[in-house]
């Protein structure tokens, strides 16, 4: 390829990327290939590069370029590349989620009748198409794949006696946060499928109550079709739109989730003629039988005039998905806040239809109505990695000759690719010299009155930061530690930005949190984190190694925590269940860290965002409290509280703080109480997909605790492994933490004492009973856990000289425990 052609290739690629930047999200990888064409093509304003310019990506033994005349439709459909043997495209990509879109238009070219072609398409880990034949005029297949290597290979395999073809290909990065978490399984509420590695095929993407949304009006180049063709009994529904009222609340749905055009329109019940009528609005969609499907519902209450006015139910295939949905409450008491809900369902055997319905709440009937704004239905790969039924097996081919041709072609193609990519790299470095490290900008700020934009000495390295009082680290050293922010080292995404695993020059592992300019967290949180963590050192607080603000970056470097968050070990990640002893020790460690924050200085420090995701575990599962971006210095000695705007995480937020905007250390105690029940029950603290009485974990757990039947809702993996007196003490501690008023809650010191005691009760040998007697375990108890034996409940506490009566502990729980605490708990922990 000549230099002039290569420069044209770079220019066109840059223009395509800039078009996406203008829309919002910036894809790292952005391949748009006009297959079989000697010239570039366009689709909805986006430029698809000529197949000639991108031919180095292709490994194929034969070159057959097909074309057809005509001016109808986009020119990318007028050419195609034909494969008579196994052929593949190899794309160099960053790891993470990508769109893969394949365009097909079956025209006739010489002896090739595209409508009769039969073939398979596969990636390294998924079969995308099998025994595929294009029967309609134009077909677009869209997939969402999580690429875990540095290359994505798309292989086209003709069926025996046939051929394969493709008109155009897209491979585009999408935000890793777009498909995350563990959606609830409709019909099996205890099941939470892990979506992180799922391959998905888009089956339907619908704009409810609104017009067609073309790809050039979507930040992620998606197309949304109107819902009219899927709607049953159209007279029961009506459409409305109100685009200006849509609110994108930080922490919830964004314009990358769905465009404003989708959230600003909806289909609702047509109940104006009879407001007392109760019925459902239903849509029906075609699906392939035998697969599980991922449903993403988009909601925005643009119909209500006030908060808490709209309550409705959601159904998938006649099964209840969610009841009494109150959108304004789900989005931080915001009217018209954009919100999405995810579900998974299994289609019935032999059924190729799925129905979705909305209907009014049967509890809140003042304003009977129901709405939905958008819906995405995606097919999930089966256990074999297949997204298509058929006989194709990856790695097979029609003949040994095809295999030999593929091997030889791959070898030659790989050699040429190395030369090509080497040339690209040299020219790219020349063009970009002097611009390395540039990022989107923030306004600089200062700490202690001095600018954070000063120059760094050339000798400063990450390994010397422990002796550098100001904790600053040069950007070059951060890049070196993370291999230039290699996406393969990305270990998570939080409210502040991405987190990378790094390694210092001495081999010490670190976690590098790089701020995202689009994040709802910014300068204030960055500064608070530095100020707080540079003051404190405690074995149960995550240590700050340093920070970097060079080139207007906002980067925080912490000690690396090998086992991640407590939340990830409770639900949604598929990790092994924690034992009861491990959970107690984790809670004790976190309580020690919070107790130190509250008492370790002349003025307490209130964390303000205590939750399971902010408690990290090292290689020995020792807990450390993390994420101090929202922390606040507590009140002076002569004050009872700090008046401040409400911040925190929904589900963990102290209701008294929320009502009065008065922050105290007891707000942390409330949040920690929620964590205690989360650790015990192993479920999300807020789950809107559950029945209304179960949505809020704190309320649900307290209901069962007051009935004396908390053991009925604990994590199933704990049954038969908890002593009833240990559970009782743990539950009573959590109950006291969740008192309505802060004055009625214990201090963190008292919480810590009680948790230590719960651990001792679990480990102690009950007098007169062998230690391995299973009748002491919760799994053997009747429902009323408070009715266990009321005999001698005193225990010998290992490592102490005296005996402690359980009743005496109960009597002391509401008062200061400082004297007793000092005898049982060492300041450095265990």
Curated annotation (Swiss-Prot):
It is a single-pass type I membrane protein. Autophosphorylated. Keywords: ATP-binding, Cell membrane, Glycoprotein, Kinase, Membrane, Nucleotide-binding, Phosphoprotein, Receptor, Serine/threonine-protein kinase, Signal, Transferase, Transmembrane, Transmembrane helix. Residues 25-405 are extracellular. It holds the Pfam family PK_Tyr_Ser-Thr. Residues 485-758 form the Protein kinase domain. GO terms for molecular function: ATP binding; protein kinase activity; protein serine/threonine kinase activity; transmembrane receptor protein tyrosine kinase activity. Glycans are attached at residues 40, 146, 217, 280, 381. Belongs to the protein kinase superfamily. Ser/Thr protein kinase family. Receptor-like protein kinase required for cell elongation during vegetative growth, mostly in a brassinosteroid-(BR-) independent manner. This is Receptor-like protein kinase HERK 1. It comes from Arabidopsis thaliana (Mouse-ear cress). The lineage of its organism: Eukaryota, Viridiplantae, Streptophyta, Embryophyta, Tracheophyta.
């Amino acid at each position: 390829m000549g230099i002039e052609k290569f420069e044209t290739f770079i220019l066109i690629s840059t223009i395509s990327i800039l078009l996406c930047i203008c829309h919002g999200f910036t894809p790292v990888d952005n391949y748009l290939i006009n297959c079989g064409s000697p010239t570039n093509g366009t689709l909805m304003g986006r430029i698809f590069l000529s197949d000639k310019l991108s031919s180095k990506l292709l490994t194929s033994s034969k070159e057959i370029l097909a074309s057809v005349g005509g001016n109808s439709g986009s020119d990318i459909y007028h050419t195609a590349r034909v494969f008579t043997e196994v052929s593949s495209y190899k794309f160099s990509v960053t790891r993470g989620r990508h769109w893969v879109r394949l365009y097909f238009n079956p025209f006739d070219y010489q002896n090739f009748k595209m409508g009769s072609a039969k073939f398979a398409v596969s990636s390294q880990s998924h079969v995308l198409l099998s025994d595929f034949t294009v029967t309609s005029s134009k077909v677009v297949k869209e997939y969402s794949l999580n690429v875990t290597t540095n290359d994505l290979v798309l292989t086209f395999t003709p069926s025996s006696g046939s051929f394969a073809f493709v008109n155009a290909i897209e491979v585009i990065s999408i935000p890793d946060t777009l498909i995350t978490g563990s959606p609830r399984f409709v019909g099996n509420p205890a099941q939470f499928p892990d979506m992180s590695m799922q391959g998905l095929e888009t089956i339907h993407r619908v704009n409810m109550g609104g017009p067609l949304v073309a790809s050039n009006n979507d930040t992620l180049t998606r197309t949304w079709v109107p819902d009219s063709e899927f709607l049953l009994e159209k007279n029961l529904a009506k459409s409305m739109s109100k685009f200006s009222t849509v609110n994108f609340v930080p922490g919830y749905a964004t314009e990358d989730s769905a465009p404003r055009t989708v959230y600003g329109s909806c289909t609702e019940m047509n109940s104006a003629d009879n407001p007392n009528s109760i019925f459902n609005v239903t849509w029906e969609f075609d699906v392939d039988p035998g697969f599980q499907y991922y449903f993403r519902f988009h909601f925005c209450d643009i119909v209500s005039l006030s908060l808490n006015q709209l309550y409705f139910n959601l159904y998938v295939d006649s099964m209840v998905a969610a009841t009494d949905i109150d959108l304004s409450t789900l989005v931080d008491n915001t009217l018209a806040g954009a919100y999405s809900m995810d579900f998974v369902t299994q289609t019935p055997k032999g059924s190729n239809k799925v129905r979705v319905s909305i209907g009014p709440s049967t509890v809140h009937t003042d304003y009977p109505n129901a709405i939905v704004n958008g819906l995405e239905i995606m097919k999930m790969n089966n256990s074999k990695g297949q997204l298509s039924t058929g006989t194709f097996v990856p790695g097979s081919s029609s003949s040994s000759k095809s295999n030999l041709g593929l091997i030889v072609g791959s070898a030659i193609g790989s050699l040429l690719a190395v030369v090509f990519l080497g040339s690209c790299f040299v020219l790219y470095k020349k063009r970009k010299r002097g611009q390395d490290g540039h990022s989107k900008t923030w306004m600089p700020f200062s700490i202690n009155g001095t600018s954070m934009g000063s120059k760094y000495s050339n000798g400063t390295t990450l390994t010397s930061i422990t002796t550098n009082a100001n904790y600053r680290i040069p950007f070059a050293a951060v890049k070196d530690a993370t291999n230039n922010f290699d996406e393969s080292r990305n270990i998570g995404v939080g409210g502040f930005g991405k987190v990378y695993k790094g390694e210092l020059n001495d081999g010490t592992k670190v976690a590098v949190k790089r701020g995202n300019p689009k994040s709802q967290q910014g300068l204030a949180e960055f500064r608070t984190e530095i100020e707080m963590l540079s003051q404190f050192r405690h074995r149960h607080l995550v240590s700050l190694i340093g920070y970097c603000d060079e080139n207007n970056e906002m980067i925080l470097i912490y000690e690396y925590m090998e086992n991640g968050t407590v939340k990830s070990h409770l639900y949604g990640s598929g990790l092994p269940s924690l034992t009861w002893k491990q959970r107690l020790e984790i809670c004790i460690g976190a309580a020690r860290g919070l107790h130190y924050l509250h008492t370790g200085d002349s003025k307490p420090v209130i964390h303000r965002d205590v939750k399971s995701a902010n408690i990290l575990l090292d290689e020995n599962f020792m807990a450390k409290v993390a994420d101090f971006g929202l922390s606040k210095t507590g009140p002076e000695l002569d004050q009872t509280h700090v008046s401040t705007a409400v911040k925190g995480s929904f589900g963990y937020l102290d209701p008294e703080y929320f009502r009065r905007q008065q922050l105290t250390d007891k707000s942390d105690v409330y949040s920690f109480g929620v964590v205690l029940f989360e650790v015990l029950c192993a479920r999300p603290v807020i789950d809107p997909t559950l029945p209304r009485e179960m949505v809020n974990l704190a309320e649900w757990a307290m209901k069962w605790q007051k009935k004396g039947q908390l053991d009925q809702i604990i994590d199933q993996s704990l049954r038969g492994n908890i002593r009833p007196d240990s559970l009782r003490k743990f539950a009573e501690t959590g109950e006291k933490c969740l008192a309505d008023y802060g004055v009625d809650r214990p201090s963190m010191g008292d919480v810590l004492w009680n948790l230590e005691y719960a651990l001792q009760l679990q480990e102690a040998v009950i007098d007169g009973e062998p230690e391995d007697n299973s009748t002491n375990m919760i799994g053997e108890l009747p429902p009323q856990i408070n009715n266990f034996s009321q005999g001698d409940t005193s225990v010998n506490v290992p490592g102490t000289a005296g005996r402690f009566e359980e009743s005496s502990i109960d009597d002391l729980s509401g008062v200061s425990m400082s004297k007793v605490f000092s005898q049982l708990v060492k300041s450095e922990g265990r």
